[in-house]
C-alpha cells in the first residue's frame, strides 16, 4: 500500500491540477501553502519553485494584459476628447492597478520573508532575486511619481544582486542566467528608457552563451536556446526602434515550465 502523501505533497499535486484547469488564483493559494509547509529554512524543490513562479506569472500576466488594453483605450478616448469616458476608464484602470499591487506585494513578501533567505545554491538565489526584480518591475510599469521611482530602484537592486551571483556561479548558457539577462535588459529598455544599456546587456549575454553553446547539456538545451532567441528578437526590435521608433511587443523570459 502506498504511503499517505504529506500535506506539502498534496498541495503540490493540487497546484498541478489547478494549472491544468487554468485556475491560477487557486494554484497560487496551493503553492503558498507549500511555502508555509517548508518551515525551518527548508528549501523548495526545483519543481515547487517553478510551480510557484508559473502560478504567479499567470495571475499577474492576466492583469498586466488587462491594464495595457485599458490604458490603450484611455489614450484613444483622451485624444477624441471624450472626458466622460476617460473618467470612467481611469476608475476602472485603478481597480486593475490595486489588484496588480496586491499580487506583487503578496509574492514580494513571500520572497523576502522566506524564499531568498533559505536559498543555498546559486541557481535558487538567482531564481528568487530575479523573481523579486520582476515583480518590482511590474509595479514600476503602472506606478507614477515617487512610487514608480522606488519600484524601479528596488528592481535594479534585485536584478544587480542576481546578476552578481549569476556571473560568479552560473554558466553563460544556464537558462536562469539567460532569463535574468533578458528581463534585466527589458527593464533598462522599458522602465529606465535606456536602449543602449538594454542592447549592450542583451548582446553580451547572447554572445557569451553562443561562445559556450557546445558545453550545453541536453536537459537545458531547449530552455537556453529559446531564451537566446528571445534575446536576439529583442535586439533586432530595439535596434530598429532606435532608427524608426516602431513599437512592437518586447519579449520577456518564459514561464519556467521545463527548467
From Swiss-Prot:
Record-linked Gene3D superfamilies: 14-3-3 domain
Bilayer-crossing regions: none
Entries under InterPro entries matching the protein: 14-3-3 (IPR000308), 14-3-3_CS (IPR023409), 14-3-3_dom_sf (IPR036815), 14-3-3_domain (IPR023410)
Pfam short name (any one): 14-3-3
N-terminal signal peptide: none
Top-rank lineage group of the source organism: Eukaryota
Family per similarity comment: Belongs to the 14-3-3 family.
Full protein name: 14-3-3-like protein
Protein source organism: Helianthus annuus (Common sunflower)
Amino acid at each position: 500500500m502506498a504511503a499517505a502523501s504529506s500535506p506539502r505533497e498534496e498541495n503540490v499535486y493540487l497546484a498541478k491540477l489547478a494549472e491544468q484547469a487554468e485556475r491560477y488564483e487557486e494554484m497560487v493559494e496551493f503553492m503558498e501553502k507549500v511555502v508555509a509547509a517548508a518551515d525551518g529554512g527548508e528549501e523548495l524543490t526545483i519543481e515547487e519553485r517553478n510551480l510557484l513562479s508559473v502560478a504567479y506569472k499567470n495571475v499577474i500576466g492576466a492583469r498586466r494584459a488587462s491594464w495595457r488594453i485599458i490604458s490603450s483605450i484611455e489614450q484613444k478616448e483622451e485624444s477624441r476628447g471624450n472626458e466622460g469616458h476617460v473618467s470612467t476608464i481611469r476608475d476602472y484602470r485603478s481597480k486593475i492597478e490595486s489588484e496588480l499591487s496586491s499580487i506583487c506585494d503578496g509574492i514580494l513578501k513571500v520572497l523576502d520573508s522566506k524564499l531568498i533567505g533559505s536559498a543555498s545554491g546559486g541557481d535558487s538565489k538567482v531564481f528568487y532575486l530575479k523573481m523579486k526584480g520582476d515583480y518590482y518591475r511590474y509595479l514600476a510599469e503602472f506606478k507614477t511619481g515617487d512610487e514608480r521611482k522606488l519600484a524601479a530602484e528596488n528592481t535594479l537592486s534585485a536584478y544587480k544582486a542576481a546578476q552578481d551571483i549569476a556571473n560568479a556561479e552560473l554558466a553563460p548558457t544556464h537558462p536562469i542566467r539567460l532569463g535574468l539577462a533578458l528581463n534585466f535588459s527589458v527593464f533598462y529598455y522599458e522602465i529606465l528608457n535606456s536602449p543602449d544599456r538594454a542592447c549592450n546587456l542583451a548582446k553580451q549575454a547572447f554572445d557569451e552563451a553562443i561562445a559556450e553553446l557546445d558545453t550545453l547539456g541536453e536537459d537545458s538545451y531547449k530552455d537556453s536556446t529559446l531564451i537566446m532567441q528571445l534575446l536576439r528578437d529583442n535586439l533586432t526590435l530595439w535596434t530598429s526602434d532606435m532608427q524608426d521608433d516602431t513599437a512592437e511587443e518586447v519579449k520577456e523570459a518564459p514561464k519556467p515550465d521545463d527548467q
